[in-house]
């Protein structure tokens, strides 16, 4: 395990990113080559986007490597470490999918169940004709990116919103990325298991995955590790409460813990069988939009893929605009030479996670500023492709 901690060298030229795709310097130690590769990918992006602090964690053939840059808080001067807690925004959806995968493999629900089967309050609404799979994969018919401002974190208001909602498209026909969609999926998964979502995550999911630095509500004892997020105007920001926030974007975690989650996804067989099956259930693709195959929480691409196409799959239009889907004839295993990824943001934080099962390779990038997805993907792509060019990631046999 390697933990490299140092300040952001903000004077470094953006052109040094090219180092990430050049051969290693002869005689340089492997750890130094990896550090140089990550430095060259990260530092220009930090400078260009005025990112106070950033953490990278890489799983390379089962070995974790950590790289920490800058400040967790500009106010008190705390530096980023692998244990610093970041808000991960929509990367939380992959944890929600894991809980749902557990409910599926325990036969508490099926993806073709109607949503109203698991919440009687929705009976008689449009959710009589919307499946759990539609909710999980953003194809319910046009649920929006966010709840309206008028809907607060109140079950009655949330229920009333869903009861009156009317679809714009036929369920199962168009993808429109949506917190209310996958949020309801997570809520219904918890209902099928007979416990509140938050309790299931904190008491079952996180412990089963070996995560001790992952929280929905950061406990007082861990507050000193919680990074301060920063908005576009450099104002300190942290995520506030919202409807189905835990299900959609509520997880706070460290680079070290999130890498453990990535490792669990790379090697589900190392977990207890119910949780191995739960993770496997999230690694199934149901339809394509362009190059992207939609799984449960995860979005997948054939690997290798060009940087431009990977950025397009994680672009603003993919998040904000509807896209007609191409349904797969049967669920497709997202394994082998595929890159599974997820972006996540809150107003003050930006996250990106990616892994390639067939290369036994994964990485985590966490920052305390919400900066463009294209920049996060650029960092990851430089590291992943650089490692391949250095011959670090042969095919997993």
Curated annotation (Swiss-Prot):
Annotated residues for binding of a beta-lactam:
90, 146, 177, 179, 370
- Any signal peptide, and if so, which residues? 1-26
Q: State the Gene Ontology BP annotations.
A: antibiotic catabolic process; response to antibiotic
> Could you tell me what induces this protein?
Up-regulated by beta-lactam antibiotics, such as ampicillin or benzylpenicillin. Expression is negatively regulated by sigma factor RpoN, possibly through promoter blocking.
Q: Which coarse location class describes where this protein primarily resides?
A: periplasm
**Keyword Mitochondrion attributed:** no
Entry-linked Gene3D superfamilies: DD-peptidase/beta-lactamase superfamily
Q: Name one GO cellular component term.
A: outer membrane-bounded periplasmic space
The UniProt entry, under InterPro entries, shows: Bact_CellWall_Synth/Modif, Beta-lactam-related, Beta-lactam/transpept-like, Beta-lactam_class-C_AS
Active site, renumbered: 90 (acyl-ester intermediate), 177 (proton acceptor)
Swiss-Prot/TrEMBL keywords:
Antibiotic resistance, Hydrolase, Periplasm, Signal
Mind telling me which Pfam families this protein's record contains? Answer: Beta-lactamase (PF00144)
Miscellaneous: The class C beta-lactamase family has a specific amino-acid numbering system known as SANC, for structural alignment-based numbering of class C beta-lactamases, or else the simpler name structural position. A multiple sequence alignment was used to derive a consensus sequence and then the consensus was numbered taking into account insertions and deletions. This allows use of identical numbers, e.g. for active site residues, despite differences in protein length.
Q: What does this protein do?
A: Class C beta-lactamase which confers resistance to penicillins and cephalosporins. Has nitrocefin-hydrolyzing activity.
Question: How does this chain assemble?
Answer: Monomer.
Q: Which family is it part of? A: Belongs to the class-C beta-lactamase family.
Protein name from the UniProt record: Beta-lactamase
The organism of origin for this protein: Pseudomonas aeruginosa (strain ATCC 15692 / DSM 22644 / CIP 104116 / JCM 14847 / LMG 12228 / 1C / PRS 101 / PAO1)
Lineage, broadest ranks: Bacteria, Pseudomonadati, Pseudomonadota, Gammaproteobacteria, Pseudomonadales
């Amino acid at each position: 395990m390697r933990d490299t901690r140092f300040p952001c060298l903000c004077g470094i030229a953006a052109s040094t990113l090219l180092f990430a795709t050049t051969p290693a310097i002869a005689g340089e130690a492997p750890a130094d080559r990896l550090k140089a590769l990550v430095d060259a990918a990260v530092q220009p992006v930090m400078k260009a986007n005025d990112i106070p602090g950033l953490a990278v964690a890489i799983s390379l053939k089962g070995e974790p490597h950590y790289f920490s840059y800058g400040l967790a808080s500009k106010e008190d001067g705390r530096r980023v470490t692998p244990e610093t807690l970041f808000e991960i925004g929509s990367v939380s959806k992959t944890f929600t999918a894991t809980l749902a995968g557990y409910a599926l493999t325990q036969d508490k629900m099926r993806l073709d169940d109607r949503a109203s089967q698991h919440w009687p309050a929705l009976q008689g609404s449009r959710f009589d004709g919307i499946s759990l799979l539609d909710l999980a994969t953003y194809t319910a018919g046009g649920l929006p990116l966010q709840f309206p401002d008028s809907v607060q974190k109140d079950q009655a208001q949330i229920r009333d919103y869903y009861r009156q909602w009317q679809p714009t498209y036929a369920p199962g026909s168009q993808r429109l990325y949506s917190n209310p969609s996958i949020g309801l999926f997570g809520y219904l998964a918890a209902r099928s298991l007979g416990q509140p979502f938050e309790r299931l995550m904190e008491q079952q999911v996180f412990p089963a995955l070996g995560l001790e630095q992952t929280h929905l509500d950061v406990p007082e004892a861990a507050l000193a590790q919680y990074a301060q997020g920063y908005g576009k105007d450099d104002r300190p920001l942290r995520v506030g409460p919202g409807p189905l926030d835990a299900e959609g974007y509520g997880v706070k975690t460290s680079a070290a813990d999130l890498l453990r989650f990535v490792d669990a996804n790379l090697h589900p067989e190392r977990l207890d069988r119910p949780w191995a099956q739960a993770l496997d259930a999230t690694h199934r693709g149901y339809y394509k939009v362009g190059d992207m195959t939609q799984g449960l929480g995860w979005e997948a691409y054939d690997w290798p893929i060009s940087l431009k196409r990977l950025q397009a799959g994680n672009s603003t239009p993919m998040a904000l605009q509807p896209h007609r889907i191409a349904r797969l004839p049967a669920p497709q295993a997202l394994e082998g030479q595929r890159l599974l990824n997820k972006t996540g943001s809150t107003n003050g934080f930006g996250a990106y996670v990616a892994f390639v099962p067939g290369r036994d390779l994964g990485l985590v990038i966490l920052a305390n500023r919400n900066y463009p997805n294209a920049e996060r993907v650029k960092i990851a792509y430089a590291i992943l492709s650089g490692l391949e060019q250095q011959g670090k990631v042969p095919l997993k046999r």
